[in-house]
Regions:
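Extended alpha-helical targeting/anchoring segments
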Residues: 1-497
Length: 497
């Protein structure tokens, strides 16, 4: 306590924390007790190899600050708990404003706390590429989301699955106009309130609803995607690009609480990056397989993924599919192209000569598919930071194409509406300035009683439009399956009532 008071008196943030045994508590149960819709709360989880849950899960609650941006116009609401309309424009351009906020949220962390700490959590939408590249964008924006949004939680819960331990953490931010002891007392009170709610023996009653099974309505008219594929192939034939990823949106009614969709998705399609962001006005719910950029201890990491086969029903079928995948020249060529992109992207923010491919052409298993994966690392240059590393490789080649800038130009020309969160990044900044992010894939935007899912296919010279259309539908199908499972579960509860 004395150390925290001294830090606050010196104008430095402090982390007020406690830990408790959590062998009977789960992240989902805690989220059901604690998350309030639309407040900016979140749950982050991970599943490796489609079967092994990650060591740490993170819940963030009751933000005191919300940052959002549209293009170069950023705004911060520092009175979020009291007035959700109190956004004030930032005087700097968007990335400068975000960089200043990340710096202001830097804090010393007790070495006894896990590394999986967050101070700012949110997303970068695809259109934020316009902050670093001069690209025209479609004017149609049916979802109307901010280009980026980040929240700063006042309470964090970090579950350590290996140690059966729960860390309760309340950041205490300095205010030289206030007594540090009052700031610490408020942080302790927040922890007391959360601990009391966690101790409640009963979960909220199951959601009960008798609603029709959802089905998708495509945003594109029949045949329109095929026309987009044909136009892209003309650009490929002309030598403009080697590949471009063209996406489309599917929508379906969904009137259940967004967290019910997340509960189903994490079971049906577990992935390394699972997230439920219950943001003001909408929710982002996803199960992404692919890292976007990680910056930790001065090291940049990117992991290009390209090349896919379904999982087999047996170990022998898995091995046969793995062998087939690695022997496929088209899959290997596509992966090599994206691996080269990853090396180039990392190199733009790296110390000269530090880029390394530490794993190449490794097959990783996920819940329903297997992918070819490579790993690229580099030392962050002394004059660069995590945001530089993020936008050196933004957007990822796996959701844009190659060469990247020309592919993005063609995407803006051929896709009829803005992508929004899709193909951007979900992630968090840690108190030490680290960044962990994933590509927004297999993700739903839940807004106004509707789920919106975008999915794309990589278009190359020999692409067949009908096949690429089916690939988009199949990728979007994981979210639809989760929505149907959630509706079915709610219907069973209603029937049982």
């Amino acid at each position: 306590m004395t150390a925290a008071l001294d830090m606050l008196a010196a104008g430095r943030p402090a982390m007020i924390w406690r830990r408790q045994v959590a062998d009977t508590e789960t992240p989902v149960a805690a989220a059901l007790k604690l998350i309030e819709p639309g407040r900016g709360d979140f749950l982050l989880e991970s599943v490796e190899g489609g079967a092994i849950r990650g060591r740490h899960s993170i819940i963030g609650l009751a933000p005191d600050l919300v940052f959002r941006a549209h293009g170069q116009h950023a705004a911060i609401n520092r009175r979020w708990p009291h007035d959700r309309d109190a956004f004030e424009p930032c005087p700097q351009p968007t990335l400068s404003a975000l960089r200043a906020l990340v710096a202001a949220c830097r804090a010393e962390v007790d070495p006894e706390l896990p590394r999986a700490l967050t101070c700012l959590v949110g997303y970068f939408g695809y259109e934020t590429v316009g902050l670093v590249e001069d690209l025209a964008q479609p004017s149609a924006d049916p979802l109307g989301l901010p280009d980026m949004m980040f929240v700063r939680p006042t309470v964090l819960l970090v579950f350590d699955r290996l140690a059966d331990t729960l860390y309760l953490i309340a950041p205490a931010w300095p205010d030289l106009a206030r007594d540090p002891s009052a700031i610490v007392a408020e942080a302790e009170a927040r922890l007391d309130a959360v601990a009391a709610r966690l101790a409640a023996t009963h979960l909220p009653a199951p959601v009960r609803a008798d609603t029709p099974e959802p089905s998708y309505t495509p945003a594109l008219a029949p045949g329109r995607y095929g026309e987009m594929v044909a136009a892209a192939k003309e650009y490929i034939a002309a030598g403009d690009i080697f590949q471009v990823v063209l996406a489309q949106r599917f929508s379906a009614p969904f009137t259940l609480p967004p967290f019910e969709l997340y509960r189903s998705l994490r079971r049906i399609n577990p992935s390394p990056f699972l997230y439920h962001l219950d943001l003001p006005g909408f929710a982002l719910i996803g199960s992404s397989p692919e890292i976007l950029v990680r910056v930790r201890d001065g090291e940049i990491t990117v992991r290009p993924i390209a090349g896919t086969r379904p999982r087999g029903k047996t170990a022998a079928e898995d091995e046969a599919n793995r062998t087939s995948l690695l022997a496929d020249p088209k899959e290997r060529a596509e992966h090599l192209m994206l691996l080269d992109l990853g090396r180039n992207d990392a190199g733009r923010a790296a110390s000269p000569g530090s880029v390394r491919v530490t794993d190449s052409y490794t097959v990783e298993l996920y819940s329903h598919v297997m992918h070819i994966v490579s790993n690229v690392t580099a030392r962050l240059a002394d004059d660069r930071d995590a945001l530089d590393a993020m936008f050196a490789g933004f957007p990822a080649g796996t959701v844009s194409g190659a060469p990247k800038v020309r592919a993005c130009q063609i995407i803006a020309e051929l896709e009829p509406e803005r992508r929004g969160a899709y193909a951007g990044g979900v992630g968090y900044f840690s108190p030490d300035g680290s960044l962990d992010s994933c590509i927004v894939l297999r993700t739903a935007v839940v807004k106004d009683g509707t789920i919106h899912v975008q999915a794309g296919a990589g278009i190359v010279a020999d692409s067949i439009p009908e096949y690429e259309q089916r690939e988009c539908e199949a990728k979007a199908g994981a979210i639809l399956a989760a929505a149907r499972e959630a509706v079915s579960r709610a219907g069973e509860s209603a029937f049982g009532q």
